[in-house]
Amino acid sequence: VGFKAGVKDYKLTYYTPNYETKDTDILAAFRVSPQPGVPPEEAGAAVAAESSTGTWTTVWTDGLTSLDRYKGRCYHIEPVAGEENQFIAYVAYPLDLFEEGSVTNMFTSIVGNVFGFKALRALRLEDLRIPPAYVKTFQGPPHGIQVERDKLNKYGRPLLGCTIKPKLGLSAKNYGRAVYECLRGGLDFTKDDENVNSQPFMRWRDRLLFCAEAIYKAQAETGEIKGHYLNATAGTCEEMMKRAVFARELGVPIVMHDYLTGGFTANTTLAHYCRDNGLLLHIHRAMHAVIDRQKNHGIHFRVLAKALRMSGGDHIHAGTVVGKLEGERDITLGFVDLLRDDFIEKDRSRGIYFTQDWVSLPGVIPVASGGIHVWHMPALTEIFGDDSVLQFGGGTLGHPWGNAPGAVANRVALEACVQARNEGRDLAREGNEIIREASKWSPELAAACEVWKEIKFEFPAMDTL
């Protein structure tokens, strides 16, 4: 027999420190915590092996393939500063291991099996470099940032949204009324909550009809284009598509999907439909914290964000830096750039492990949402810039005078911040002053400032380097 069976060292085959990475390789950076007594090279090689061609023993069918052509390679390992027994293992995967245009297959290969591996205490996928050759097999976002601005005819400022609350329990008619008031008051978008699908108290078709009525009424009164993110997420792909088709028939501009709970296969299907039929696609990241919140195990959100840009979506929730949900500033801005820009340089201080070239794949607009209100407006405008959606749910509907005045307050605050920025003022330093000045001209804003002046969500961010 030409080989010996038995448990073998992975590092003999899969640890290749001299390997020169190819332009077509998919590169991964894993944070590896080996079990006591397992050397980091062996742990890194094990990850490379188990996520590509390897298995735990030599098999005779190895002789029927070219391992050198198909194997993943751990080509570099470095210790994590300030952490004991934690390493960053860099793995290169040949492009042929992946099906074209399938985020599902990419994840099944790279993170499908290795995370339960005994030789590791914990494993986290920190970043992926997607080569242009692979990027080009994806359609990506249905429209992208510039086309969205052209469709909506809104330029030079962030867009404003609002999630309709209470998220569950309203009837379709009352839900539509809340949508109308917010849009009429000056918001660009309102949003179905991620868990609004089609429940007994409000079936999807009724909701879509009343929301469409609200959109057209608000558009007629304001002369602005309005939208409501109609959540098409459903229990089956067929049902999801039925909802998207109905939205298109109503002529509304945008639908929505929960891409992690719905799954990448469903998401990519919907994104293709949206491009073919002129619908924008808003993406909510429900369930992301289950995957990305642990520092030493799971997948960092920047990887989930890259995957979404490939699968397709025009907006995605990306943290706020200032509200009630997770997000450290530099790291958040790192993956915000990965969503919006065409070319992003490697920058470890922002958690970006690889230079990423998207070769003209359309960009995704980041959405800041969760515990934000008018006092946050200067910070949000400065941090996220124009190409963003700022979403105030409670920060609109919690206004003491009602939804429409709440919307007015947010729009006035936003316009004041954009004007101040364009005049060259420093939003970080003068933000509170800018809001105070604007509230002299807007009783709605003054009332909002009064309600939320003391509210803070003071916890340290977990997403640190």
UniProtKB/Swiss-Prot annotation:
Its cofactor is Mg(2+). It is found in: Plastid, Chloroplast. Its EC number is 4.1.1.39. GO terms for cellular component: chloroplast. The keyword Chaperone does not apply. The disulfide bond which can form in the large chain dimeric partners within the hexadecamer appears to be associated with oxidative stress and protein turnover. GO terms for biological process: photorespiration; reductive pentose-phosphate cycle. Binds 1 Mg(2+) ion per subunit. The record marks K324 as: Transition state stabilizer. The modification N6,N6,N6-trimethyllysine is found at K4. Its main location: plastid. The active site is at K165, H284. The modification N6-carboxylysine is found at K191. It comes from the Eukaryota. Heterohexadecamer of 8 large chains and 8 small chains; disulfide-linked. The disulfide link is formed within the large subunit homodimers. Belongs to the RuBisCO large chain family. Type I subfamily. HAMAP family: RuBisCO_L_type1. The basic functional RuBisCO is composed of a large chain homodimer in a 'head-to-tail' conformation. In form I RuBisCO this homodimer is arranged in a barrel-like tetramer with the small subunits forming a tetrameric 'cap' on each end of the 'barrel'. This is Ribulose bisphosphate carboxylase large chain. It comes from Bauera rubioides (Dog rose). The gene is rbcL.
